């Protein structure tokens, strides 16, 4: 027979389903009679207590995080999901608050984290969907839709250029295609690139990764490989594309770095592949390219997790720390000067810099001060 358990109202006993007779072996008849006469303990109250106990047990199994960093990570996850569910007008209004530059030719916005540029499977809302609404908010109800000039990955934040008409969009797209636009990205890396500055010039190709889950990734397609200590030329894949990235370490510790990246070419996932597979320094929060064979949360060292204030089980929620920091466009139309566009870092990026003890260059002292304020919260 089950042992008695105690509730807020006294002892209750898990019987064997045989009726009141099973209780008489544990309690005296007077006590049993009194309990039967009492209306304080009834089936409804008992059921409520059982439900309350179950909720309490579930809470103990999955405690709510009180860690400030983990709360911020959870907020980013919730925010990213909300972006896919808000009304297009709400999203367009949010984008107007992040406008970096606006003139008769262009509108430059600060692209938020987790927002896709184009539609696709599973995408409920993207930037392309709200371009007509955004144009009307800026130029009135008769305004024609804005046009995309280039793209950024869903997880990448920062400078994004839109044009008021198709001709201007094509002009800017041609500048990107002919590599006349200077693009600078900032990334936080796991490990420190060696040497601290250089150029990665390794072609990239898309391949199928063989693992528990079959999936496709971009990867390196080098022209040479080492064979018994000798450098041997490799036959180039016909699908490989030339990919060149210039990089410089801006700040570093023993286990992480703030790196400025200047892609000379514009191949899909170029920066992520060159950092992870070329320099063995994956971007913090890159859960796709931190391991070739697996699609799994990024594995971080105990020291890095401790600095970030996270457990490994929460690493899956770390956002990709890749930010389109700056674009320099040549003079457009009747303009005589180049257009230098700089975008402030997102708050989660700034906070991670502070937690990892990474310093920003002196000219970015205001954002550095913001990092310290966030860390003190």
From Swiss-Prot:
Enzyme class: isomerase
UniProt-recorded name of the protein: Pseudouridylate synthase RPUSD4, mitochondrial
Location of the active site: 153
Protein family: Belongs to the pseudouridine synthase RluA family.
Catalytic activity: uridine in 5S rRNA = pseudouridine in 5S rRNA; a uridine in tRNA = a pseudouridine in tRNA; a uridine in mRNA = a pseudouridine in mRNA
Coarse class of the protein's main subcellular location: mitochondrion
Gene Ontology cellular-component annotations: mitochondrial matrix; mitochondrion; nucleoplasm; ribonucleoprotein granule
Record: transit peptide: 1-15
Subunit structure: Interacts with 16S mt-rRNA, mt-tRNA(Phe) and mt-tRNA(Met). Forms a regulatory protein-RNA complex, consisting of RCC1L, NGRN, RPUSD3, RPUSD4, TRUB2, FASTKD2 and 16S mt-rRNA.
Molecular function terms, GO-annotated: mitochondrial ribosomal large subunit rRNA binding; pseudouridine synthase activity; RNA binding; tRNA binding; tRNA pseudouridine synthase activity
Entry's EC annotation: 5.4.99.-
Lineage: superkingdom: Eukaryota
Subcellular compartments: Mitochondrion matrix; Nucleus; Cytoplasm
Classification via PROSITE patterns: PSI_RLU (PS01129)
Pfam families named among the record's database cross-references: PseudoU_synth_2
UniProt keyword Coiled coil, yes or no: yes
Record function comment: Catalyzes uridine to pseudouridine isomerization (pseudouridylation) of different mitochondrial RNA substrates. Acts on position 1397 in 16S mitochondrial ribosomal RNA (16S mt-rRNA). This modification is required for the assembly of 16S mt-rRNA into a functional mitochondrial ribosome. As a component of a functional protein-RNA module, consisting of RCC1L, NGRN, RPUSD3, RPUSD4, TRUB2, FASTKD2 and 16S mt-rRNA, controls 16S mt-rRNA abundance and is required for intra-mitochondrial translation. Acts on position 39 in mitochondrial tRNA(Phe).
UniProtKB keywords: Coiled coil, Cytoplasm, Isomerase, Mitochondrion, mRNA processing, mRNA splicing, Nucleus, rRNA processing, Transit peptide, tRNA processing
Originating gene: RPUSD4
Coiled coil: 36-62
Gene Ontology BP term (one): RNA splicing
């Amino acid at each position: 027979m089950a042992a008695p358990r105690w509730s807020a109202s006294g002892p209750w006993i898990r019987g064997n389903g045989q009726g009141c007779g099973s209780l008489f072996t544990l309690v005296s008849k007077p006590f049993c009679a009194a309990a039967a006469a009492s209306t304080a303990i009834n089936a409804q109250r008992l059921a409520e207590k059982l439900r309350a106990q179950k909720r309490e047990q579930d809470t103990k199994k999955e405690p709510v995080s009180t860690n400030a960093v983990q709360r911020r990570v959870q907020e980013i996850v919730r925010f990213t999901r909300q972006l896919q569910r808000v009304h297009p007008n709400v999203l367009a209004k949010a984008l107007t608050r992040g406008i970096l530059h606006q003139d008769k030719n262009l509108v430059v916005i600060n692209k938020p984290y987790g927002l896709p540029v184009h539609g696709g499977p599973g995408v409920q809302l993207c930037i392309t969907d709200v371009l007509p609404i955004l144009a009307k908010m800026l130029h009135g109800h008769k305004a024609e839709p804005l046009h995309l000039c280039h793209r950024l990955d869903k997880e990448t934040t920062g400078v994004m250029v839109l044009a008021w008409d198709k001709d201007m969009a094509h002009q800017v797209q041609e500048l990107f295609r002919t590599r006349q636009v200077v693009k600078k990205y900032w990334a936080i890396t796991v490990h420190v690139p060696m040497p601290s500055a250089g150029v990665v010039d390794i072609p990239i190709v898309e391949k199928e990764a063989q693992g528990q889950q079959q999936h496709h990734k971009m990867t390196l397609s080098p022209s040479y490989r080492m064979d018994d200590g000798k450098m041997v030329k490799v036959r180039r894949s016909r699908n490989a594309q030339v990919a060149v990235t210039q990089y410089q370490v801006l700040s570093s510790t023993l286990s992480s770095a703030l790196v400025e990246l200047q892609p000379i070419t514009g191949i899909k996932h170029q920066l992520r592949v060159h950092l992870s597979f070329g320099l063995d320094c994956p971007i913090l929060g890159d859960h796709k390219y931190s391991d070739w064979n697996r699609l799994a949360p990024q594995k971080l060292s105990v020291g890095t997790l401790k600095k970030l204030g996270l457990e490994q089980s929460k690493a899956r929620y770390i956002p990709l720390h890749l930010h389109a920091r700056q674009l320099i466009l040549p003079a457009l139309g009747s303009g005589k000067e180049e257009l230098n566009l700089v975008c402030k870092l997102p708050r989660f990026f700034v906070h991670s810099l502070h937690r990892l003890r990474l310093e920003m260059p002196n000219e970015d002292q205001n954002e550095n001060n913001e990092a310290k304020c966030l860390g003190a919260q």
